[in-house]
Amino acid sequence: NVYYAADKSPLKEAIIALNGSSKGLVNNVCVPSDVSPLYAPEGKSLISVSLLGLHRDEHIPTEVKKELAAWFGEQVDGWQHLRTDIIKHALPEQAPKENPQNNTKEGKGFLKIDDIMICGDHTTSASIEGAIISGNQTAAALLKSMGK
């Protein structure tokens, strides 16, 4: 992930913007400070950019900004690079037949072993969306089991 501070969010709402072209470095962009300003330096927006593959090149922050200029225009010129985190094995390999959601009777999004509910993207699909779905489904099942 590559992180930038910006004067304002490039997004009009709190969403994850996906690269649908299957080209380039960028997989998705989100602005965590659109959800909570506490995530960003004071008075700034925090831009989080997820890349495909491992990139150790010191020029990656500049290359990412060049690519995102096609998405957001000249505003990226004012973005300040904060840090780059290289996360090995960020997403698990997950072939469809190995997907745990196919083997659980409790429903999509979590596993139940004994009386323990297990959630996470590893129980749905290896993605941010998978993690959110899993958390929501697990919370709903837990509330139902409590009679709420």
Where are these regions (language model features)?
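Mid-domain catalytic core of redox enzymes
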Residues: 1-60, 66-71
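Flexible, glycine-rich phosphate/dinucleotide-binding loops
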Residues: 38, 91, 125
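Short FAD-binding loop at a beta-strand-to-alpha-helix junction that anchors the flavin cofactor
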Residues: 48, 107-127, 131-136
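Active-site proximal loops enriched in glycine and acidic residues that flank catalytic Cys/His/Asp
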Residues: 51-53, 86, 120
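Conserved strand-to-helix beginnings and helix N-cap segments that scaffold or border functional pockets
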Residues: 58-62, 129-132
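Flavin (FAD/FMN) cofactor-binding core of flavoprotein oxidoreductases
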Residues: 60-111
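Internal hydrophobic alpha-helix adjacent to the cofactor/substrate pocket in enzyme cavities
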Residues: 131-148
